[in-house]
Amino acid sequence: MQRSPQFVDGQFRNPVPTRQMVPGAALAMARTQLSREGRLRRSPVGRIPVHRPTAADWGEPPASGLRLTWMGHSSVLAEIDGHRVLFDPVWGERCSPFTWAGPRRLHPVPLALGELDPVDAVVISHDHYDHLDMPTVKALIRTGTRFVVPLGIGADLELWGVPAERITELDWHESAAVGELTLTATPAQHFCGRGLRGPQHTLWASWVVAGPANRVFHSGDTGYFPGFAEIGAEHGPFDATMIQIGAYSEFWPDIHMTPEEGLRAHADLSQGSPAGALLPIHWGTFNLAPHAWSDPVERTVAAAREAGAKVAAPLPGKPFEPADEQIVDPWWRSVALPPTHGWPSWPAVTPSADAFEVVR
């Protein structure tokens, strides 16, 4: 770790000063938590529908060579050019160090982990409990898969029983080969922290996975920063981006993106090309922020349509091919508390390269 340019004075750091929380946020958050209507809107009012993948979904290879299945939160199975990569798998009931306290899952996992066919690699973005789940990792050990993680996280995996030879740790801008795929750790603007361990002792990252014909980007958790354009210039364009658009707040603007910032990141990564699909992640599964439960996806779809960007918003567990036309069905509206003035209409805009501009 000491060799990393990100490791300074005994800690991993972002290139620019990054606030985990703005001054005075604790008191303001307490007031927000006391709002009855706010509490109601932060959770669904009905049972979240989930698609259980079947052989009909996964039985044949994707025609385009790329298929994504959002399992909820930031967990995504990417089938890319004949390989299977599982990002940030969290199958646990809570994202917490405790089984009896902490944010609880709002919908069941689409598929039991034991029913998931083996994957070629598990990729972890950082060590927070909603991205690195110990019971899930322990279950995946039995499959013989390889774990590709940022610097420092390998120690946790070894402690949990993952053989050292199946762990690959990477710094930003370093790559590893998995079959015909190249996995590259890329920058993110976030932080780490787990249990009672000292601060910033593991790195956080976004990820690029490139195959012979397709390439994807997974943001992990991050604030909006100029690095997206640099990643796009070096590794893009992408056939799909998986972008964090939930758990944002005015109380921590540096470490989580709003939906509109998520779209800006997608535009930067795409270098002005509207062809790649945006899959919103980090929403819907756990209640982690003061915003309404459905706001992240509502705002993302609205912003994407206005910009002429291709966006997918599938049910948890519903596979899709980013190359296909994406027809968004607002399934979440059936289980969310409607806004005071009703559900808004989305802009009906046809995607075009002219409408989709890189935001600087």
Regions found by a protein language model. Name each.
Residues Q2-P5, P290-R360:
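C-terminal regulatory/interaction regions
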Residues M1-E115, V149-G220, D239-I245, R299-P319, ...:
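Metallo-beta-lactamase
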